[in-house]
């Protein structure tokens, strides 16, 4: 971020900056201090975020965007590598596993003894689909991989509209931790969408943004048209959908009283009718809405 903002433009300026930090105060006398800074620069250059010409430092367009997104360079690089492997018609769980495996999602969801069997079965089902490397069960990274997989399944069940009580009982994840994971997943998907622009992966952006909206609201894809309206969350949307009111067309063509009866609020029902208009719609009208 120092280079991206042009606060420093040379290697010696960067080293002097770090010498003035608490880390520098502690380790400035360490023989390898400057080498550590230079090694970190080489890593960021390898990631494609930085150009080093002699002693001059300049962030690449991709590096500047990573800095603007407040992503850790290593985590951003891992995300980019996964996005490049992602197919345009990706399954939800594949992208969820990618972001759940990212270092920015740490700490991952803890696993209990009862989780191992179903997580191993889930891993077998996913191993040929996911874009992240799956370790062997005897590798030291295996338990961490299972934690990442559990995190991905947790978020998937959230967008499948399973409630917080179910997630607490089955995954031992309290509401506060769940909200933290949801928030981080949203942020990573926003970052993924923005990075796709610079990577030229435009065909993946729509699917990423749709999944981000679903995570924010905890809904299946079929509820998106309803939840886009003010005053309709996932509970009200599901009640409307189950009653056969599935979109703006359906809302326009039923009475305010029926909507109020379903969602339990006359005031919100009136607001919804104002948003969609009172005129009855045909299928052709709906397509042009």
Give, region by region, the residue ranges found by the protein language model.
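C-terminal helicase lobe
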Residues: 1-42, 75
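Active-site-proximal structural scaffolding
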Residues: 7, 30-37, 43, 59, ...
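Long C-terminal interaction/binding lobes of large macromolecular proteins
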Residues: 18, 206, 236
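Membrane-interface starts of transmembrane alpha-helices
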Residues: 30-37, 204, 208, 265, ...
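C-terminal helical accessory/scaffold domains
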Residues: 38-40, 46-228
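Alpha-helix C-terminal capping/helix-coil junction sites
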Residues: 45-46, 241
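Helix-hairpin-helix
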Residues: 223-243, 249-252, 256-270
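Alpha-helical interaction/regulatory segments in DNA maintenance proteins
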Residues: 258-288
């Amino acid at each position: 971020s120092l280079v991206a903002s042009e606060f420093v433009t040379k290697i010696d300026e960067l080293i002097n900056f770090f010498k003035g930090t608490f880390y520098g105060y502690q380790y400035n006398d360490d023989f390898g201090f400057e080498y550590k800074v230079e090694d970190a620069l080489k890593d960021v250059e390898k990631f494609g975020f930085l150009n080093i010409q002699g002693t001059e430092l300049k962030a690449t367009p991709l590096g500047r965007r990573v800095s603007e997104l407040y992503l850790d360079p290593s985590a951003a690089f891992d995300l980019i590598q996964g996005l490049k492997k992602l197919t345009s018609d990706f399954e939800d769980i594949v992208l969820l596993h990618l972001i759940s495996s990212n270092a920015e999602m740490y700490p991952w969801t803890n696993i209990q003894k009862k989780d191992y069997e179903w997580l191993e079965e889930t891993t077998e089902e996913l191993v040929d689909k996911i874009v992240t490397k799956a370790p062997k069960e005897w590798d030291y990274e295996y338990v961490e991989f299972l934690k990442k997989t559990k995190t991905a399944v947790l978020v998937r069940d959230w967008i499948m509209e399973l409630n917080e009580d179910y997630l607490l009982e089955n995954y031992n994840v309290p509401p506060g931790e769940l909200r933290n994971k949801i928030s981080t997943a949203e942020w990573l998907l926003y970052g993924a969408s923005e990075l796709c622009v610079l990577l030229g992966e435009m065909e993946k952006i729509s699917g990423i943004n749709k999944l981000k909206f679903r995570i924010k609201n905890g809904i299946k894809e079929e509820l998106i048209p309803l939840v886009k309206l003010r005053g309709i969350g996932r509970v009200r949307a599901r009640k409307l959908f189950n009653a056969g009111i599935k979109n703006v067309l359906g809302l326009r063509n039923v009475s305010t009283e029926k909507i109020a009866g379903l969602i339990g609020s006359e005031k919100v029902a009136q607001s919804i009718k104002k948003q969609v208009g009172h005129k009855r719609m045909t299928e052709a009208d709906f397509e042009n809405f």
